[in-house]
C-alpha cells in the first residue's frame, strides 16, 4: 500500500480505496471477537503507517471495513468460513451469513468495530470516507430492505460518535438499485465494469439527478478477467472525470497495473495519469463548481465520436473521444464539427492531446445567439478542449 500511495502521489493522484479483509489489512481475526482487545494489532499498526504516509503525500483513503464475501458461503469471493461471526469459529455464534444483518448481538458488536475504526483513524485528514460494506447486496440472502435498515442504523451510529464528520457511503455491484442513492449516504459510490463508456455516463447522469457528489470507486473493462492496458484505464479515467464524477475511475486491477512497464521501463498507466491530474488541478484551482453540459446543449456531428463535458465559471471543457478508443482502436478523424451552448462573446478554442498533455491547436471563435461552433481536425483516440 505504501508503494501504491507513492506512485499515485508522484503522478498527481490523491485518493485510493482500501478494503479491510483477510486479503490485505484485516482487523477482524477468524478466532477473535469484535472487541478492542481482539482486533489484529499488527494490521492495525500497519494501517496507522498507511494513514501517516497518506497524510504526508496528500492522498485520501476510502476505507472499506466490511465486504460481501465475509457474509457469503458460496461464490468466488466467499470468506464466510474465516469470518469471526461464523459459529464454526472460536467465538462465532451465527449459523448462516444472512443472520449477520438482523442479529442484535452482531449489530452491537459491529458497531463496536466501527467505533474502534472511528476512534483510531477518524482523526486523519486522509480519511476520505467510510464505505460501510463493499457490494453489500452481493452478500448471501440479503434483501435491499434489510440492507437499507442496517445501513441506516450503522450510519446513524457513526454520525453520533464521529466528531470529525467523516463521509459515509456504501457500494453495490449494480448501479440499478435504490440503496446506493439513499439519503443516509453522503455521496454516491458506483461500481462499473464495461466496454461501453456510455454506461459510465448513464450511471453518472442517474447520480447527478440525486444532487449528490458521485465517485466511480471500482471500474474495469470486465469483472471476470483483468483486461488492463493504457487504452482501457485512460478512457475510463477521462470518461469518469469529464462525464461528471468527482474524480477518475478507480481501477479494480491495480496489482496488474502496478506490474506494467513500457520499453523504457516506466509504468505507462502512472505516466498517463499525470496528464489528467494536471488538467483537473488547473480547473480545481478556480474554486468554481462544475456544471455538466447536457446533451441538448452539445452536438458532435461526427458519427464515430462523441463529446461530453462541463462548464466552470465562464469556461467550458469538453472531452472528445472515438467511440472505439476503449478497445484500443481509433480512426483518424479528419474533421469533427462541434457546437456547444455558450454565452455570446469571443472565445479561444484550445485542443490538448490527453496522452501527452501537448497543445494541438488554438483558434479564436465567436459565440452568437447562444451557440459556438468549431471544428477539431486530424485527431485520434481522444482530445480535451478548453473554451
Predicted regions and their residues:
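Active-site mouth of glycoside hydrolases
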Residues: 1-186, 190-199, 210
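Catalytic-core region of carbohydrate-active enzymes that cleave or remodel glycosidic bonds
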Residues: 53, 59, 182-258
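Residue-level signal for short, function-critical loop segments
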Residues: 67, 136, 220, 322-324
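Short, surface-exposed tryptophan/glycine-enriched loops
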Residues: 121, 375-379
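Residue-level structural signal for beta-strand termini and adjacent loop
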Residues: 133, 364-365
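Active-site flanking residues adjacent to catalytic metal/cofactor-binding acidic residues
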Residues: 134, 217, 385
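Aromatic- and carboxylate-lined catalytic core of secreted/periplasmic carbohydrate-active enzymes
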Residues: 222-224, 233-363, 378-387
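Short strand-edge motifs at loop-to-beta-strand transitions and within beta-strands
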Residues: 370-372
Amino acid at each position: 500500500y505504501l508503494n501504491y500511495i507513492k506512485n499515485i502521489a508522484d503522478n498527481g493522484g490523491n485518493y485510493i480505496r482500501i478494503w479491510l479483509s483477510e486479503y490485505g489489512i484485516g482487523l477482524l481475526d477468524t478466532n477473535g471477537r469484535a472487541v478492542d482487545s481482539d482486533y489484529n494489532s499488527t494490521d492495525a499498526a500497519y494501517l496507522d503507517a498507511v494513514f501517516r504516509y497518506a497524510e504526508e503525500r496528500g492522498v485520501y483513503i476510502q476505507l472499506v471495513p466490511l465486504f460481501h464475501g465475509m457474509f457469503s458461503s458460496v461464490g468466488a469471493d466467499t470468506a464466510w468460513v474465516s469470518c469471526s461471526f461464523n459459529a464454526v469459529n472460536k467465538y462465532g455464534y451465527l449459523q448462516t451469513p444472512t443472520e449477520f444483518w438482523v442479529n442484535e448481538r452482531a449489530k452491537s458488536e459491529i458497531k463496536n468495530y466501527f467505533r474502534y475504526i472511528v476512534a483510531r483513524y477518524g482523526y486523519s485528514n486522509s480519511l476520505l470516507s467510510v464505505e460501510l460494506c463493499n457490494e453489500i447486496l452481493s452478500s448471501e440472502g440479503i434483501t435491499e430492505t434489510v440492507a437499507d435498515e442496517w445501513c441506516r442504523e450503522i450510519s446513524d451510529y457513526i454520525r453520533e460518535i464521529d466528531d470529525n464528520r467523516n463521509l459515509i457511503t456504501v457500494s453495490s455491484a449494480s448501479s440499478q438499485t435504490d440503496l446506493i442513492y439513499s439519503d443516509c449516504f453522503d455521496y454516491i459510490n458506483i461500481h462499473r465494469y464495461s466496454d461501453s463508456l456510455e454506461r459510465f455516463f448513464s450511471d453518472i447522469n442517474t447520480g447527478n439527478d440525486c444532487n449528490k457528489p458521485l465517485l466511480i470507486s471500482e471500474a474495469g473493462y470486465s469483472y471476470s478477467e483483468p483486461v488492463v492496458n493504457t487504452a482501457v484505464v485512460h478512457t475510463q479515467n477521462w470518461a469518469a472525470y469529464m462525464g461528471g464524477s468527482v474524480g477518475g475511475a478507480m481501477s479494480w486491477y491495480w496489482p496488474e497495473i502496478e506490474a506494467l512497464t513500457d520499453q523504457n521501463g516506466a509504468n505507462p498507466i502512472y505516466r498517463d495519469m499525470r496528464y489528467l491530474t494536471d488538467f483537473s488541478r488547473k480547473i480545481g484551482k478556480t474554486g468554481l463548481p462544475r456544471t455538466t453540459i447536457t446533451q441538448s446543449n452539445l452536438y458532435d456531428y461526427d458519427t464515430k465520436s462523441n463529446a461530453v463535458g462541463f462548464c466552470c465559471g465562464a469556461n467550458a471543457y469538453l472531452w472528445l473521444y472515438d467511440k472505439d478508443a476503449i478497445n484500443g482502436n481509433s480512426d483518424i478523424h479528419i474533421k469533427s464539427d462541434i457546437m456547444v451552448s455558450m454565452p455570446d462573446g469571443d472565445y479561444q478554442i484550445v485542443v490538448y492531446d490527453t496522452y501527452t498533455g501537448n497543445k494541438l491547436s488554438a483558434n479564436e471563435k465567436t459565440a452568437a445567439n447562444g451557440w459556438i461552433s468549431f471544428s477539431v481536425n486530424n485527431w485520434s483516440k481522444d482530445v480535451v478542449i478548453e473554451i
